[in-house]
């Protein structure tokens, strides 16, 4: 693909960075727009969004390193190398980092927690979809070798250098699969957002939809550092995906059940 969009002398613009940045800006714009419809202060929404992005990047990078700790423990100098910085990260780690930051900020500024999460969930899905196209361009987060007609073949040595991407071999386009999933999730979440019956409904739907999709996508991922757990039964990301589905299901059940209780019964 095209890991580097163009060169000017020694300077180059990484395609991954451009698309991820675009995804972040688009996601933030949608999140702030949704927040204003929920009566949330736009300044608080913007500040929260910036904090979430920064902590999400840190969380994604930390889990990327943890998942490939056998390599990084033997080469600690590579943790802060330019190669590692360009290699992307693990989205579930970013989701955890962003969530921790969001919980802190929302509590500190007394924002309506579930309503805020509902406002941000669709933007997160769309931003992630755009970012995954950047992964395809960079060659990271690639899939297993395949004979299917939709297989993608990487030939740029930069992809191999940064992400160990196999060259000249048709691979499952896991980046495009996940981008399509997240685009569909965005459409579904916006539909729910406009019709939601209780705060937390959009967040719960996102956790369930993304958790299920990511669990199964892990079976065809083949990039190194998958972070296997329980003796290789599943990857760390699959474990996090299961936790997301359970959490989403609990939020939906608890909030919808509370809404169904007659007002006099809640006194």
Per-segment meaning from a language model:
Residues 1-267:
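A feature for loop-to-transmembrane-helix boundaries and adjacent hydrophobic helices
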